[in-house]
């Protein structure tokens, strides 16, 4: 847990929002988009979830606008986190321009996600933050992608 707070502090996310995400039974699009948008410097740490969603949509990192309180399936959590680093995927990742399905499979193959996890499952905020820090540990030797 200390590693989570330390790594997230590097990206200046609001402690209040991080606490809220940690206590979420099921993480939402707004929460995940906030993490991704603040990590890339697209929004300030006091930005709303709606602003984070909008900026990721405007930057082409999301295909559509979603409702901030809509639960996000794990496959889309991994896809949004993949926007932070240049994850070297296999052939299908490259052929599909890093489609969410193949990014999810790549993270499983890399050992970032447990093999028992289902792509359509909803995960807690605690799990999403743990996944975020695992990605940071695994892929974090690279610079963050900022477009």
Question: Locations of the language-model features?
Answer:
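Primarily EF-hand calcium-binding motifs
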Residues: 60-62
């Amino acid at each position: 847990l200390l590693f989570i707070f330390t790594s997230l502090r590097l990206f200046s996310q609001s402690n209040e929002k991080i606490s809220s995400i940690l206590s979420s039974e099921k993480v939402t699009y707004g929460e995940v988009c906030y993490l991704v948008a603040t990590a890339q410097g697209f929004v300030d740490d006091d930005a709303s979830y709606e602003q984070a969603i909008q900026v990721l949509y405007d930057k082409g990192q999301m295909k559509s606008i979603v409702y901030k309180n809509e639960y996000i399936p794990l496959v889309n959590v991994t896809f949004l986190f993949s926007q932070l680093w240049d994850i070297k995927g296999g052939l299908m990742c490259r052929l599909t321009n890093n489609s969410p399905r193949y990014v999810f499979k790549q993270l499983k193959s890399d050992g970032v996600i447990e093999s028992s996890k289902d792509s359509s499952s909803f995960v807690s905020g605690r799990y999403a933050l743990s996944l975020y820090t695992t990605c940071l540990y695994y892929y974090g030797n690279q610079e963050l992608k900022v477009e």
